[in-house]
């Protein structure tokens, strides 16, 4: 199974086999200092066990700052590999509940965090329009966004599998 994953990654120009497990990626990771993210382990797991790496919560802790990738002595595109692993995970229905919720909000109202009545009221108190110049204010733009998301099959990716 890991050979299949490595082939998929290599097809994207992401060859992980040259990793020498020096740990520079993990040691320089800002997110790893505060979370369980261990980029070296993710790379190792990608080489060994596809199922484990695609369902690993830590895969989603990367902030995509590219520090690991910039510092890798072998020039391994670590962040790019993590992003591709995430794409593969989503295609297999392995999306975190929080990401699924936010994605469903975007599909429904065009925003990850829709405006509630309290926020609209607070905006008015601050002298702002209750609804900012976004797709929430323009029904045609919202429908256009929904069409775009459907056309690129975002709704199918978000659907529970």
Swiss-Prot record:
Pathway: Cofactor metabolism; coenzyme M-coenzyme B heterodisulfide reduction; coenzyme B and coenzyme M from coenzyme M-coenzyme B heterodisulfide: step 1/1. InterPro entries: 4Fe4S_Fe-S-bd, 4Fe4S_Fe_S_CS, CoB/CoM_hetero-S_Rdtase_csu, HdrC_iron-sulfur_subunit, Helical_ferredxn. SUPFAM superfamilies: alpha-helical ferredoxin. [4Fe-4S] cluster 2 binds at residues 29, 62, 65, 68. It comes from the Archaea. Binds 2 [4Fe-4S] cluster. Its EC number is 1.8.7.3, 1.8.98.4. Belongs to the HdrC family. This is Ferredoxin/F(420)H(2)-dependent CoB-CoM heterodisulfide reductase subunit C. It comes from Methanosarcina acetivorans (strain ATCC 35395 / DSM 2834 / JCM 12185 / C2A). The gene is hdrC2.
């Amino acid at each position: 199974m890991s050979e299949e994953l490595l082939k998929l990654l290599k097809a994207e120009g992401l060859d992980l086999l040259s990793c020498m497990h020096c740990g520079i990626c993990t040691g320089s990771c800002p997110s790893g200092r505060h979370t369980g993210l261990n980029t070296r382990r993710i790379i190792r797991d990608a080489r060994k066990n596809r199922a484990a790496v695609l369902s690993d919560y830590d895969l989603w802790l990367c902030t995509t700052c590219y520090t690991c990738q910039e510092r890798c002595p072998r020039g391994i595109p670590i962040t790019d590999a993590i992003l591709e692993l995430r794409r593969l995970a989503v295609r297999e229905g392995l999306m975190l509940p929080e990401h699924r919720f936010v994605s469903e909000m975007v599909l429904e109202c065009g925003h990850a965090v829709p405006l509630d009545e309290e926020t609209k009221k607070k905006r008015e108190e601050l002298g702002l329009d209750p609804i900012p110049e976004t797709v929430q204010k323009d029904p045609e733009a919202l429908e256009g966004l929904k069409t775009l998301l459907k056309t690129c099959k975002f709704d199918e990716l978000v659907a529970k599998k």
